[in-house]
Amino acid sequence: MKKDYIKIIDKIANWMNQTLTEAKSNGFVYGVSGGIDSALICAIASKFFKDRSLAVRLDIFNSVNDTKDANLVISHFKVNSVDKNLEQVFNTFIKDLPDNKLALMNLKSRLRMVCLYYYAQTYNYLVCGTSNADELYTGYFTKFGDSGSDFIPLANLTKTDVRECSKILGVPSQIINKDPSAGLFENQKDEDDLKVSYLEIDNFLENNPISESSKNRILDLHKISEHKRNMPKTILKLGEIIK
């Protein structure tokens, strides 16, 4: 069945507005990375929340292309925005820490989250996450990093859905067609990390047939990332402990 993406976009915008109203929030803040997911949020912000949103471009040794693409998205949609360079903060933070590539990559995402929440609290805004359904199901996000948000409008959109909505809202084609990347290191590509394509994840989430090996890979990613999607595990109630 063909999806009505115009209706989907309207439903998302209405849900976002309801979320802000319930929280008695003045608006929302979101990071713009140069990727398609944050570009779609930027497009929605421009169309429905022009004066109640703030795009933040957060630089921590970003690639030249990601910086250009983030600036393109912000200028294209003419949204309220600020730039914040966190490279000095990052360098100071890691100065006396042991070297660990994965921890350093995730630190970038966590520093960005901290900065977004600073702006959010300053303006009585909520932090808008940009993760899509594929990323959330497979755990392809940084715990307390890009997952650190108050609401996630794209949570039930597959990567294909994100692309189709982006086309409708006029996201530049170079953003839609670029290889998905978290941008945490040079030449990084999401599908290389996931070891499965977004199309296969999309089909899995839509209950369409995929290869058994891809299905097992997706299920394994979901299983090992379960802790990322839940609140911190708590101990039993005292009454149950001392039985």
From Swiss-Prot:
<dbReference type="InterPro" id="IPR022926">
    <property type="entry name" value="NH(3)-dep_NAD(+)_synth"/>
</dbReference>
<dbReference type="Pfam" id="PF02540">
    <property type="entry name" value="NAD_synthase"/>
</dbReference>
<dbReference type="GO" id="GO:0004359">
    <property type="term" value="F:glutaminase activity"/>
</dbReference>
<feature type="binding site">
    <location>
        <begin position="31"/>
        <end position="38"/>
    </location>
    <ligand>
        <name>ATP</name>
    </ligand>
</feature>
<feature type="binding site">
    <location>
        <position position="130"/>
    </location>
    <ligand>
        <name>ATP</name>
    </ligand>
</feature>
<dbReference type="GO" id="GO:0003952">
    <property type="term" value="F:NAD+ synthase (glutamine-hydrolyzing) activity"/>
</dbReference>
<protein>
    <recommendedName>
        <fullName>NH(3)-dependent NAD(+) synthetase</fullName>
        <ecNumber>6.3.1.5</ecNumber>
    </recommendedName>
</protein>
<keyword id="KW-0479">Metal-binding</keyword>
<feature type="binding site">
    <location>
        <position position="150"/>
    </location>
    <ligand>
        <name>deamido-NAD(+)</name>
    </ligand>
</feature>
<feature type="binding site">
    <location>
        <position position="159"/>
    </location>
    <ligand>
        <name>ATP</name>
    </ligand>
</feature>
<keyword id="KW-0547">Nucleotide-binding</keyword>
<feature type="binding site">
    <location>
        <position position="110"/>
    </location>
    <ligand>
        <name>deamido-NAD(+)</name>
    </ligand>
</feature>
<feature type="binding site">
    <location>
        <position position="181"/>
    </location>
    <ligand>
        <name>ATP</name>
    </ligand>
</feature>
<dbReference type="GO" id="GO:0005524">
    <property type="term" value="F:ATP binding"/>
</dbReference>
<feature type="binding site">
    <location>
        <begin position="227"/>
        <end position="228"/>
    </location>
    <ligand>
        <name>deamido-NAD(+)</name>
    </ligand>
</feature>
<dbReference type="GO" id="GO:0009435">
    <property type="term" value="P:NAD biosynthetic process"/>
</dbReference>
<feature type="binding site">
    <location>
        <position position="135"/>
    </location>
    <ligand>
        <name>Mg(2+)</name>
    </ligand>
</feature>
<keyword id="KW-0067">ATP-binding</keyword>
<dbReference type="InterPro" id="IPR022310">
    <property type="entry name" value="NAD/GMP_synthase"/>
</dbReference>
<comment type="pathway">
    <text>Cofactor biosynthesis; NAD(+) biosynthesis; NAD(+) from deamido-NAD(+) (ammonia route): step 1/1.</text>
</comment>
<keyword id="KW-0436">Ligase</keyword>
<keyword id="KW-0460">Magnesium</keyword>
<feature type="binding site">
    <location>
        <position position="143"/>
    </location>
    <ligand>
        <name>deamido-NAD(+)</name>
    </ligand>
</feature>
<dbReference type="InterPro" id="IPR014729">
    <property type="entry name" value="Rossmann-like_a/b/a_fold"/>
</dbReference>
<dbReference type="GO" id="GO:0046872">
    <property type="term" value="F:metal ion binding"/>
</dbReference>
<comment type="similarity">
    <text>Belongs to the NAD synthetase family.</text>
</comment>
<comment type="subunit">
    <text>Homodimer.</text>
</comment>
<keyword id="KW-0520">NAD</keyword>
<feature type="binding site">
    <location>
        <position position="37"/>
    </location>
    <ligand>
        <name>Mg(2+)</name>
    </ligand>
</feature>
<dbReference type="GO" id="GO:0008795">
    <property type="term" value="F:NAD+ synthase activity"/>
</dbReference>
<dbReference type="InterPro" id="IPR003694">
    <property type="entry name" value="NAD_synthase"/>
</dbReference>
<comment type="function">
    <text>Catalyzes the ATP-dependent amidation of deamido-NAD to form NAD. Uses ammonia as a nitrogen source.</text>
</comment>
<dbReference type="GO" id="GO:0005737">
    <property type="term" value="C:cytoplasm"/>
</dbReference>
